[in-house]
A protein has these predicted regions:
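Short, charged phosphate-coordinating catalytic segments
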Residues: 125-129, 199-222, 280, 325-326
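Basic, Lys/Arg- and aromatic-enriched nucleic-acid-binding interface segment
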Residues: 167-206, 210, 266
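Active-site/catalytic core of tyrosine-dependent DNA strand-transfer enzymes
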Residues: 248-301
Length: 368
């Protein structure tokens, strides 16, 4: 089985499907992935779901199981199967117990989330999936859908088992002020400097920056609007809701310098366009940004990613005392809980600053 990129007739939208060994689309996956495309899920999300569900179908085929007759125990075996080396999944090679898992716990949980979403969608549309969903409580399952006759049984306890692999919560990777300055100073062009400065100050995502239009920048008000829309470069606003973010006068001046000294008379709605490679004036793409990051890593001598600038912005705001509700709105999170879960981390230095500000280390009633 393999995953195939497809283009939706008429709209030209990008989607993905899963083909069996004969090159025929796997029907339930084909319909589900088409549904995700129809409801405007990100192409990257649809692609990830396609690969995750492909893996489950390979597992089912290896055990001769029908997807509609899967039991909770089969899901548990699937988790164990995922963590085997590729050579051990077919059963031809014995795997010693001491061999480390080949798939990270976070990846396993992501695949389980995709699988849970698929089964919930099938049940919602009348497919008979047996008693799987009545026994399985996927980790982090959300949504307002409730099964038929839910009102009859909602007061009764219905214990369900969660299947998830324990994962340590990774801390967001952030950059220090000297590192950010080094990155900006290493940029050869104002366009690149403005792009990275925008991400560091506003906390926007790469896709939100690449989809930016000139009309989205209100220079007098020093505000930038990030608006979900279809973009020629496939850039996307992940949040799905427009938001307006205040920015500094310095960032607006940098935008003006970029327009005056590099952008010139180009006729394009997009703020970030090809100027030095590729079709001049065409909207800048994700690969172009990732290539820029790779070149800058070599120049500055340390590793970083584009998303680190967003993490740095959020962490800096919170450390400077910006209320978490404001930070959540600026980042475009769906809820404050998301912001708290991602950025509610403290280093020892953060804790010391908070305790010193509260006078914890001075004026003690007990002497040592």
């Amino acid at each position: 089985m393999h995953v195939q990129r497809v283009v939706v007739p008429g709209s030209g939208a990008e989607s993905w499907t899963v083909l069996d060994g004969d090159g025929v689309p796997v029907e339930p996956l084909e319909r589900y992935l088409a549904y995700l495309t129809d409801v405007e899920r990100s192409p990257n999300t649809v692609r990830a779901y396609a690969f995750d569900l492909r893996d489950f179908w390979v597992f089912l085929a290896g055990r001769g199981l029908d997807w509609r007759a899967v039991r909770l125990e089969d899901i548990g075996e699937y988790v164990a199967w995922l963590r085997l080396p590729a050579a051990g999944r077919g059963g031809e090679v014995a795997v010693l117990p001491s061999v480390a898992p080949q798939v990270a716990a976070a990846t396993v949980n992501r695949k389980l989330s995709a699988l849970a979403a698929f089964y919930c969608h099938q049940a919602r549309h009348g497919a008979d999936v047996g008693g799987l969903l009545s026994a399985w409580r996927p980790a982090g399952q959300r949504g307002g859908w409730k099964p038929f006759l839910h009102h009859v049984s909602k007061g009764r306890p219905a214990p369900r088992r969660a299947i998830a692999v324990k994962t340590p919560r990774p801390l967001p990777r952030v950059l220090g002020p000297e590192q950010v300055q080094a990155i900006l100073d290493a940029c050869d062009h104002l366009r690149d400097r403005f792009l990275l400065a925008l991400m560091w100050e506003s906390g926007c995502r790469v896709g939100e920056a690449l989809g930016l239009r000139h009309e989205d920048i209100a220079a007098a008000e020093r505000e930038i609007a990030f608006v979900p829309r279809v973009n020629a470069n496939n850039a996307r606003c992940k949040s799905g809701q427009p938001r307006t973010v205040p920015v500094s006068a310095g960032l607006i001046r940098l935008w003006g310098d970029y327009l005056h000294l590099e952008y010139g008379q180009l006729d394009s709605d997009y703020v970030f366009v090809n100027l030095f490679a590729g079709p001049r004036g065409q909207a800048l793409t994700y690969p172009a940004v990732y290539d820029l990051i790779r070149r800058l890593r070599v120049k500055v001598g340390f590793s970083f990613g584009a998303h680190w600038l967003r993490h740095t912005a959020a962490t800096r705001m919170l450390r400077d005392g910006v209320p978490i509700e404001v930070v959540s709105e600026i980042l475009g999170h769906g809820s404050v809980a998301i912001t708290s879960a991602v950025y509610g981390h403290l280093t020892a230095a953060d804790a010391r600053r908070a305790l010193e500000a509260a006078g914890w280390f001075t004026g003690s009633e007990v002497s040592w």
